[in-house]
């Protein structure tokens, strides 16, 4: 078994009703899942994948592989009634805000992670516990494994839910994202794709370049980006907004340039996107 170091940042709780891996199907959460499958750490009771409906096809293909008997525990899918992109373009302003790059500078507010990731996962947890949406669950009943790695330790924060205790296996294992890649390569596992919505403004040029290699997905994102600056949307968003950090239309953005800006996924502190 791998030697884990519980401390003030992350710790194991004794005898929870449910141990669940928050599975983003990216490199970090995949590494945790496969470490459990190989017996290097204890196995969770299950994993939950929150499906926004807008992940890259490569993520869904990787998820299907994980579901093919690779893991000794089930993967449950938590999915809202409609995809995030559908809600966004339908004008669901309260439920579907993503962090656009604002033409005048800065980024807009967002609630996409909470409404398309956090809430569906919590609803699924309640379902697995046999508790309704308003039923009581004792504090500390659930140990939720989050795929934040050592190099992203600033993303850590409490669950914000009394009955869910966030645990960070990779922090306890002292593993960075690069350590995860090395662990996977040493055991001849495929390199997982980056988990995120295809139109996520947090991604840098590497993400956009990877997306452009999938023509259908690239065309979909180009159309969403252009739609953002149609007159009705300019009025809705009180100005021009963009998906690319350069604040120009994505079709014109220099995605060949090196990524030298901040890692915007560091703004996503729940640990359910990009992992």
Stretches found by the model and what they are:
Residues 1-275:
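Nucleotide-activated chemistry modules centered on ATP-dependent adenylation/adenylyltransferase
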């Amino acid at each position: 078994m791998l030697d884990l170091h519980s401390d003030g940042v992350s710790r194991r709780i004794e005898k929870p009703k449910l141990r669940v891996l928050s599975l983003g199907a990216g490199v970090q959460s995949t590494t945790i899942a496969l470490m459990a499958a190989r017996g290097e750490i204890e196995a969770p009771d299950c994993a939950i994948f929150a499906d926004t409906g807008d992940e890259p096809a490569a993520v869904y293909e990787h998820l299907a592989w994980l579901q093919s008997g690779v893991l000794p525990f089930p993967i449950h899918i938590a999915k809202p009634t409609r995809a995030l992109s559908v809600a966004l373009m339908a004008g669901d302003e309260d439920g579907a805000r993503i962090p656009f790059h604002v033409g005048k500078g800065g980024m807009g507010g967002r609630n996409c992670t909470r409404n398309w990731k956090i809430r569906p996962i919590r609803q699924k947890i309640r379902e697995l516990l046999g508790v309704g949406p308003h039923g009581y669950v004792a504090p500390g009943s659930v140990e939720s494994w989050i795929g934040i790695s050592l190099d992203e330790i600033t993303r850590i924060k409490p669950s914000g839910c009394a009955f869910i205790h966030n645990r960070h296996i990779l922090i306890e294992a002292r593993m960075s994202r690069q350590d995860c890649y090395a662990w996977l390569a040493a055991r001849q596992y495929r390199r997982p794709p980056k988990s995120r919505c295809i139109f996520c403004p947090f991604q840098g040029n590497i993400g956009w370049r990877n997306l452009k290699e999938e023509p259908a997905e690239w065309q979909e994102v180009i159309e969403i980006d252009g739609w953002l600056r149609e007159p009705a949307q300019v009025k809705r968003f009180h100005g021009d907004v963009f998906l690319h950090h350069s604040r120009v239309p994505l079709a014109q953005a220099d995605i060949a340039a090196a990524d030298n800006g901040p890692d915007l996924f560091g703004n996503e502190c729940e640990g359910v996107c990009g992992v």
